[in-house]
Amino acid sequence: MNQYETVFILTPVLSDVQMKEAVEKFKGILQAEGAEIINEENWGLKKLAYPIQKKSTGFYQLIEFNAEPTVIDKLELNFRRDERVIRFLTFRMDKYAAEYAAKRRSVKSNKKED
C-alpha cells in the first residue's frame, strides 16, 4: 500500500450540502476500494490562479489516504466523469512528504486544542 494525497477543486456554484455530498461520494469510492483515509481537509472557497471553465473561484478539498495503486485509476475516472470537479491532482507521497504531512497534522491538531 502506498500513501497518496489528492486535492480537487469543486465548482463554486454548489451549496454547502452539495459540496459535502460530492466529498462524501469520493470518500465512499476510496473506502469501497479498501483505502484507509488518513486525513481530510476542507480549504474552503479560494480564488483560482487563472479561470477554469469560466470560473475564477472554487472549493478546495484535500484527502490523504493509503491505498493500492489500482484504486487511483478508479478515483480519477470518477473525478473526470463528475461535472462538479473542475480540477484534481493525485500524487504518491514519498517518505519525506509523508513525514511532513504527519508533522503538519500534529501541529494543526495542537493548535485546535489550544
From Swiss-Prot:
Keyword Membrane in the entry? The reply is no
Q: Which GO terms describe its biological process?
A: translation
GO molecular function annotations of the record: small ribosomal subunit rRNA binding; structural constituent of ribosome
**What's in the keyword line of the UniProt record?**
Ribonucleoprotein, Ribosomal protein, RNA-binding, rRNA-binding
Q: Which PANTHER family match?
A: MITOCHONDRIAL 28S RIBOSOMAL PROTEIN S6 (PTHR21011), SMALL RIBOSOMAL SUBUNIT PROTEIN BS6M (PTHR21011:SF1)
Instruction: Name any GO cellular component annotation.
Output: ribonucleoprotein complex
Give the gene that encodes this protein. rpsF
Q: Which InterPro entries match?
A: Ribosomal_bS6, Ribosomal_bS6_sf, Ribosomal_S6_plastid/chlpt, Transl_elong_EF1B/ribsomal_bS6
The entry assigns this protein to a family as follows: Belongs to the bacterial ribosomal protein bS6 family.
List, alphabetically, the SUPFAM superfamilies matched. Ribosomal protein S6
Biological source species: Bacteroides fragilis (strain ATCC 25285 / DSM 2151 / CCUG 4856 / JCM 11019 / LMG 10263 / NCTC 9343 / Onslow / VPI 2553 / EN-2)
Q: What's the stated role of this polypeptide?
A: Binds together with bS18 to 16S ribosomal RNA.
Q: What is this protein called?
A: Small ribosomal subunit protein bS6
